Amino acid sequence: MQKLNRAEVEMILASGSSLAGSDLSEINLSEVDFSGSDMSSCDLRYTNLTGALLDSVNLTDSNMGAADLSSASLRKSTLKNVDLRWAILKDADFSDSDMQGIGLLEANISGAILRNANLSNGDLRRTDFSGASLLGANLSDSNLAMAALTNANTEGVSFDTCNTYGVKF
């Protein structure tokens, strides 16, 4: 896995090439437009992606632990089996995204938009969803133990077979 810097990432994106399998950890990629890119199996740990455009991006199997995606847009993206533990996702937009099997352990997703997102089979333990919009989201078969859903919009949310031990609604 080759470690890339911001300039190299921007050149790859401009050429239309894939970033799949790249090491993008610990670099500042804030405000970068990744829309439509293949970023599957990337290492994005501790990466600054604040305000980045990640709409319709394939992030399947990527490690994004402790990344900062505050105010990022990830609409209609694929985040299957992505590790986002300890990540900062405040005010990010995940509308219509496929997030099956996502790991959000202790992530801060407060104020985010997860409208019609699929978070089934996710590890959502101790995740802060305060003030988030989960309108129509699918959380079936997820582990929500000790999560905070204070002031979150949960209208139409599927909590079927979820572990809701200690959840703060």
What is each PLM-predicted segment?
Residues 1-169:
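Tandem repeat scaffolds
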